[in-house]
């Protein structure tokens, strides 16, 4: 039977067993190397309260702390939430990360990036 992908959907290579992690969406237990991992970096303070805090702060130019969460998704939840997409056989061989869209000040995609995407 043909193999669908060279990595078997994992990043194990030589390790017999990998500890499981839980999917943040459905709590399914999946091997840590198979899970789709994303970092969620957010400000602890919401955008509406940032100005109030900076005015009330004793320290000038105080950098507000951020939360750093590593999110683990199972394959089915990652596809359902469009974190990863299903790709064709030829595109599956491409290991490079996809191009990230560049936004200008009005949160619009720049024309140069839109032209690259159209090709």
UniProtKB/Swiss-Prot annotation:
GO MF annotations in UniProt: mRNA binding; structural constituent of ribosome
Comp. bias intervals (Basic and acidic residues): 103-119
Disordered: annotated span: 1-20, 88-119
Primary location group: cytoplasm
Compartment annotation: Cytoplasm
GO biological process, alphabetically ordered: cytoplasmic translation; maturation of LSU-rRNA from tricistronic rRNA transcript (SSU-rRNA, 5.8S rRNA, LSU-rRNA); ribosomal subunit export from nucleus; ribosome assembly
GO terms under cellular component: 90S preribosome; cytosol; cytosolic small ribosomal subunit
Domain of life (superkingdom): Eukaryota
Intrachain S-S bonds: none
InterPro entries: Ribosomal_eS26, Ribosomal_eS26_CS, Ribosomal_eS26_sf
Keywords: Cytoplasm, Ribonucleoprotein, Ribosomal protein
Described purpose of this protein according to its UniProt entry: Component of the ribosome, a large ribonucleoprotein complex responsible for the synthesis of proteins in the cell. The small ribosomal subunit (SSU) binds messenger RNAs (mRNAs) and translates the encoded message by selecting cognate aminoacyl-transfer RNA (tRNA) molecules. The large subunit (LSU) contains the ribosomal catalytic site termed the peptidyl transferase center (PTC), which catalyzes the formation of peptide bonds, thereby polymerizing the amino acids delivered by tRNAs into a polypeptide chain.
UniProt xrefs under PANTHER family: 40S RIBOSOMAL PROTEIN S26
General remark: Present with 16300 molecules/cell in log phase SD medium.
Oligomeric and partner information: Component of the small ribosomal subunit (SSU). Mature yeast ribosomes consist of a small (40S) and a large (60S) subunit. The 40S small subunit contains 1 molecule of ribosomal RNA (18S rRNA) and 33 different proteins (encoded by 57 genes). The large 60S subunit contains 3 rRNA molecules (25S, 5.8S and 5S rRNA) and 46 different proteins (encoded by 81 genes). eS26 interacts with eS1 forming part of the mRNA exit tunnel. eS26 interacts with TSR2.
UniProt record similarity statement: Belongs to the eukaryotic ribosomal protein eS26 family.
Protein name: Small ribosomal subunit protein eS26A
């Amino acid at each position: 039977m043909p193999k669908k992908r060279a990595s078997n959907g994992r990043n194990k290579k030589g390790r017999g067993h990998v500890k499981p992690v839980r999917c943040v969406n459905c709590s399914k237990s999946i091997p840590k190397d198979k899970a789709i991992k994303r970092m969620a970096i957010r400000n602890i303070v919401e955008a509406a309260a940032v100005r109030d805090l900076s005015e009330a702060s004793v320290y000038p130019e105080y950098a507000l702390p951020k939360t750093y969460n590593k999110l683990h998704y199972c394959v089915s939840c990652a596809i359902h939430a469009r974190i990863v997409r299903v790709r064709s056989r030829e595109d599956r061989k491409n290991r490079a990360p996809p191009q990230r869209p560049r936004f200008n000040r009005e949160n619009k995609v720049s024309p140069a990036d839109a032209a690259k995407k159209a090709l």
